[in-house]
């Protein structure tokens, strides 16, 4: 948790998509990662972009498993847990970011992640606040609600709106029902006031789940969800109609995985159901479709032509731990793990393979041509950084970081050092000094946009 006086907004780990190796693995985490694969992105203002990220890393304070199954996250899986003295923001990389409790109108800023978390409850932020103008782009009801939280990683937006799902009360429930101890993503608002809305079911078996999205262009997407029992019945019907022996497909899944609680609800397809520009010309097939293993793991991705474009295989013992993935028409890339769940081997039959050896503050990467790199690290959790790299050719490069993980200096293989001076508040680079002592300066406006730069020769 967060201690009084500790920096707020510190993550439980480095970003899974940061330092990567091969196809790809994050050696600082020992995790198999897929930083981002986009399945759906129609152009327009504030468009609905459906992308998938995978990480085998397991946080100690996970959000529930999302509709893409264990290990996978999509942007809509952002979630805020409200604990007694701590706010835990679960990002779409499977990590936990820890903030101190906020009062209405108060904000927390993560310097290491460049992320603001603001609690509603005030019509305006202080005039000098970096988010004051962006705050005014929000509808008044969002700004004034102390029960909503808003997050952004830029003074230019967009806002991620964290609220709760309105639900149908039970017959014997005492009203008004208390709000849940968490907040989920209900929409996005950009700096022009345009909105993207996530429609969540108010009741029934999919209560609280996203079943529809309206983007900034007014297009409406329907997200088709399935339960484990429905997928099991479909598998039995397909087996009987094909005359095959039905596979073992359980009607229920265990309620908990290493990646969090699991209700077994999965996304099976996304349809475009309304387009104001082409209301009579809607596609007759889903824009993307997903296939699932009997254990509720993402097995396949099909595009709008119903062509399989991706396939995934998982460990028999550990649900959600990816051991192979493949692009259609290419060979499987396979992975092996140690007893701590860290990737030790990456096998590529059509290219370089890698092995990973983990020691305290040191990771050794060896490829199939017997070339070796050694990464030396400092820090823990979200502030872990690579401070020295021994390259395969014998050269060494080094880096220095400040207390919040920002880069201060880099020394190349010849011993030449370049220094970086970040702004204390924003983390933006304001000055770069090259090894010969020549300096360049950079200036920004209130929205963190670069407005001017001065070179070593004084020219602006």
Predicted features and spans:
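Intrinsically disordered, low-complexity segments enriched in small residues
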Residues: 1-63, 94, 136-142
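Short alpha-helical segments and helix-capping/turn motifs at coil-helix boundaries
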Residues: 32-37, 73-75, 81-85
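N-terminal targeting and processing segments
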Residues: 52-53, 74-77, 109
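Short, polar loop/linker segments at the starts of domains and inter-domain junctions
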Residues: 59-73
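Extended charged/polar low-complexity repeat regions
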Residues: 68-70, 85-460
């Amino acid at each position: 948790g967060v201690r009084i006086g500790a920096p707020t907004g510190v993550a439980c780990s480095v970003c899974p998509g940061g330092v990567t190796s091969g196809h790809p693995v994050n050696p600082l985490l020992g995790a198999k990662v897929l930083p981002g694969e986009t399945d759906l992105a129609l152009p327009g203002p504030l468009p609905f972009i459906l992308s998938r990220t995978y990480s085998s890393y397991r946080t100690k304070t996970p959000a529930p498993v999302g509709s893409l199954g264990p290990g996978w996250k999509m942007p809509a899986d952002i979630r805020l847990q409200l604990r007694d003295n701590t706010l835990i923001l679960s990002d779409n990389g499977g990590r936990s970011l820890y903030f101190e409790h906020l009062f209405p109108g108060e904000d927390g800023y993560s310097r290491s992640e460049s992320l603001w978390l603001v609690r509603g409850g005030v019509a305006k932020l202080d005039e000098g606040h970096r988010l004051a103008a962006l705050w005014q782009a929000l509808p008044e009801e969002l700004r004034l609600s102390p029960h909503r939280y808003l997050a952004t990683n830029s003074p230019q937006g967009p806002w991620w709106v964290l609220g709760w799902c309105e639900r149908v009360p039970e017959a014997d429930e005492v009203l008004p029902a208390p709000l849940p101890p968490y907040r989920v993503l209900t929409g996005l608002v950009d700096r022009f006031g345009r909105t993207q809305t996530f429609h969540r079911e108010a009741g029934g078996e999919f209560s609280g789940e996203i079943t529809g999205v309206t983007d900034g262009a007014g297009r409406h997407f329907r997200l088709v969800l399935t339960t484990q029992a429905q997928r099991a019945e479909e598998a039995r019907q397909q087996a009987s109609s094909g005359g095959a022996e039905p596979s073992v497909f359980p009607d229920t899944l265990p309620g908990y995985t290493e990646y969090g609680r699991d209700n077994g609800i999965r996304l099976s397809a996304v349809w475009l159901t309304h387009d104001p520009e082409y209301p009579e010309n809607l596609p007759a097939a889903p824009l993307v479709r997903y296939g699932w293993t009997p254990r509720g793991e993402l097995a396949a991705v099909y595009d709008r032509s119903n062509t399989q474009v991706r396939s995934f295989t998982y460990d028999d013992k550990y649900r959600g731990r990816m051991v192979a993935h493949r692009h259609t028409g290419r060979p499987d890339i396979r992975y092996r793990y140690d007893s701590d769940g860290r990737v030790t081997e990456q096998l590529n039959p059509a290219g370089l393979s890698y092995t990973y050896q983990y020691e305290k503050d040191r990771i050794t990467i060896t490829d199939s041509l017997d070339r070796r790199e050694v990464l030396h690290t400092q820090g823990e959790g979200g502030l872990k950084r690579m401070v020295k790299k021994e390259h395969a050719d014998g050269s060494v490069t080094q880096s220095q970081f400040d207390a919040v993980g920002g880069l201060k200096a880099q020394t190349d293989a010849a011993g030449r050092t370049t220094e970086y001076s970040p702004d204390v508040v924003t983390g933006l680079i304001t000055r770069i000094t090259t090894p010969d002592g020549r300096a360049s300066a950079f200036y920004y406006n209130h929205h963190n946009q670069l407005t001017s730069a001065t070179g070593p020769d004084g020219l602006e």
